[in-house]
Design a protein with these regions (language model features):
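Secondary-structure boundary/capping motif
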Residues: 2, 25-27, 74-75
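Short, mixed-charge low-complexity intrinsically disordered segments
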Residues: 44-82
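Residue-level detector of intrinsically disordered/flexible regions characterized by low predicted structural confidence
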Residues: 4, 22, 70-72
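Short amphipathic, charge-patterned alpha-helical segments
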Residues: 35-42
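A short, exposed loop/beta-hairpin motif centered on an aromatic-Gly-Thr core
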Residues: 19-33
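A short beta-strand micro-motif
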Residues: 3-10
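Short N-terminal binding/cap micro-motifs at the start of the first secondary-structure element
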Residues: 12-17
Length: 82
């Protein structure tokens, strides 16, 4: 499965986070069962590193989001291309 990676600029409207703008920064493909881990490794390969425990990977069924653990702010998203 192939994914497009986007960096997210989002704002909080009081109830939920809304994407304001996104920037394509790369893509990755994987056959692994653990797609969340493959997403994190792809970001690491692009030079994006997170402190342990600061982010969480959320799979909503349509895409994967890396969110700030405390605020829930989306930072990166992986969107399926196939």
């Amino acid at each position: 499965m192939k994914f497009e990676i986007r960096q997210i600029d989002a704002w909080f409207d009081g109830e939920a986070w809304t994407y304001n703008e996104s920037f394509r920064i790369g893509e990755f493909s994987t056959r692994a069962e653990n797609v969340k881990r493959a997403f994190c490794r792809a970001l690491h390969g692009l030079g994006v590193v997170f402190y342990r425990g600061r982010v969480v990977v959320v799979d909503d069924g349509d895409c994967l989001e890396i969110q700030n653990r405390k605020s829930g702010e989306p930072l990166f998203v992986a969107i399926p291309m196939d």
